Amino acid sequence: VKVDDNQEDGSVILICVTDEKKITWLKDMKEISSGDTNKLTWDLGSSTKDPRGIYECKGSSNESKSLQIYYRMCQNCIELNLATVAGFIFTEIVSIFLLAVGVYFIAGQEGVRQSRASDKQTLLNNDQLYQPLKEREDDQYSHLRKK
């Protein structure tokens, strides 16, 4: 069995190399064509439909060789080899280093702060030690009751 995947429409065709007239096509040990066919080719359809499996063509002598088909269809895949992985690791180390340097320099700056209202202290006049309490209402809980 040979594979022809150089079709314009992207289809995958299997070619049975035999001199026999009657051929049976099998996929994963299951019959996919009748034994009376004389087609030496079998169309698996488009390669994007992922035509995986073990294919065989058997003649009347029941001798065949199998062919395993496996298409790896990946649109956005990256080939991971040693150089790619080393590039990822190097880029990660450099970015962490630059981030650490940036945080160090920004955190180490002593900039001029704007004073806020909460930073100002209210000073007591005339050097008083204590500030007198403000007037308050006497409610029912401010006095003890006599029984």
UniProtKB/Swiss-Prot annotation:
Record-annotated ITAM domain positions: 119-147
Domain Ig-like: 7-64
Phosphoserine modifications at: S115, S118
Keyword NAD: no
Pfam family, one: Ig_4
Binding partners and assembly: The TCR-CD3 complex is composed of a CD3D/CD3E and a CD3G/CD3E heterodimers that preferentially associate with TCRalpha and TCRbeta, respectively, to form TCRalpha/CD3E/CD3G and TCRbeta/CD3G/CD3E trimers. In turn, the hexamer interacts with CD3Z homodimer to form the TCR-CD3 complex. Alternatively, TCRalpha and TCRbeta can be replaced by TCRgamma and TCRdelta.
Recorded GO MF terms: transmembrane signaling receptor activity
Membrane-protein topology: Single-pass type I membrane protein
Parts of the chain that traverse the membrane: 86-106
Keyword annotations: Adaptive immunity, Cell membrane, Disulfide bond, Glycoprotein, Immunity, Immunoglobulin domain, Membrane, Phosphoprotein, Receptor, Transmembrane, Transmembrane helix
GO biological process: adaptive immune response; cell surface receptor signaling pathway; establishment or maintenance of cell polarity; positive thymic T cell selection; protein transport; regulation of lymphocyte apoptotic process
Name under which the protein is recorded: T-cell surface glycoprotein CD3 gamma chain
GO cellular component: alpha-beta T cell receptor complex; external side of plasma membrane
Notes on the domains: A di-leucine motif and a tyrosine-based motif are individually sufficient to induce both endocytosis and delivery to lysosomes.
Species the sequence originates in: Ovis aries
